[in-house]
Amino acid sequence: MAQATQCLKALGHPIRLGILCALKDGECNVQQLETMLGTSQSNISQHLNQMKHRDILVSRREGNQVFYQVRDVRMFELLNLLQTIYCGDDDA
């Protein structure tokens, strides 16, 4: 239950939701996320660290860049469900 609570807390901010949406297509570095989300590098880094701390993201270093990806792809199923419930279904 504690893990579910941490997961839902991580989804409780628009930037973190945006990060998850951006990572649906594969791993990204901070600069890519900054471009996609239109917010500062420091803001994105803060949210990435929170998500890593909650075991939602993993990272790997390549040279001086750090790439992030979702630890468990089932997270996208939850994200899709939330989008269907709260954003409506375009096919309906």
Feature-to-residue mapping (PLM):
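Amphipathic alpha-helical dimerization/coiled-coil segments
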Residues: 1-3, 75-92
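N-terminal helix-turn-helix DNA-binding core of bacterial DNA-binding proteins
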Residues: 2-42, 66-74
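Short C-terminal domain-edge/linker segments immediately following a structured domain
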Residues: 25, 52, 89-91
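Short, hydrophobic secondary-structure boundary micro-motifs
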Residues: 32, 60, 78-79
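Residues within the DNA-recognition helix of helix-turn-helix
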Residues: 47
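Beta-hairpin "wing" of winged helix-turn-helix
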Residues: 52-62, 69
